[in-house]
Amino acid sequence: MIGLIQRVREARVEVDGVVVGRTGRGLLALIGVQRDDDEPQARRLLERILGYRVFPDEAGRMNRSVRDIGGGLLLVPQFTLAADTRKGMRASFAPAASPERGEALFHRLLGLARESGVPVEAGRFAADMQVHLINDGPVTFWLEARPSAA
């Protein structure tokens, strides 16, 4: 499972001109679900998103997490993150989870996030969304939670 996190001053996501999710200071996390992902990857990715230190402390060092600052989290499903772009001029979506599986795992991640105590809102799975953000920094990180080798 992939999370592209961006430190934001504010962000919102719209569907058909209607705001379906927003946050003030916090994180915008674009989420890609891969074919072999399952609940352990959702749990691990969320743990990393909520604990990743991307906000400055008193000395200006990135030593605080979204939890530490009392920030919000906007989760947006984005299946294109799971694409294979290593060859050619067109992405292959073979590594991505099926739409049904991707939606189920995204909603599981969202449910876990809502249980975390951090204010959470979300985009809509498989919708044509417009994402607006004021990126703070910019600060952007690619996080992954991969299945363990059996």
Swiss-Prot record:
Mainly resides where?
Answer: cytoplasm
- Top enzyme category: hydrolase
Residues of the signal peptide:
none
Compartments reported by the entry: Cytoplasm
InterPro entries from the xrefs? Daa-tRNA_deacyls_DTD, DTD-like_sf
State the Pfam families in the record: Tyr_Deacylase
Reaction(s) catalysed by this chain, per the record, are: glycyl-tRNA(Ala) + H2O = tRNA(Ala) + glycine + H(+); a D-aminoacyl-tRNA + H2O = a tRNA + a D-alpha-amino acid + H(+)
EC code: 3.1.1.96
Keywords in UniProt for this one?
Answer: Cytoplasm, Hydrolase, RNA-binding, tRNA-binding
In its UniProt record, a GO molecular function of this protein is:
Gly-tRNA(Ala) deacylase activity
Q: Where is this motif: Gly-cisPro motif, important for rejection of L-amino acids?
A: 137-138
Keyword Mitochondrion set for record: no
Record GO cellular component, one term = cytoplasm
Q: What assembly does the database describe for this protein?
A: Homodimer.
Known NCBIfam families for this protein?
D-aminoacyl-tRNA deacylase
Kindly provide the name given to this protein in its UniProt entry: D-aminoacyl-tRNA deacylase
User: Which organism's genome codes for this protein?
Assistant: Alkalilimnicola ehrlichii (strain ATCC BAA-1101 / DSM 17681 / MLHE-1)
Q: Which gene encodes it?
A: dtd
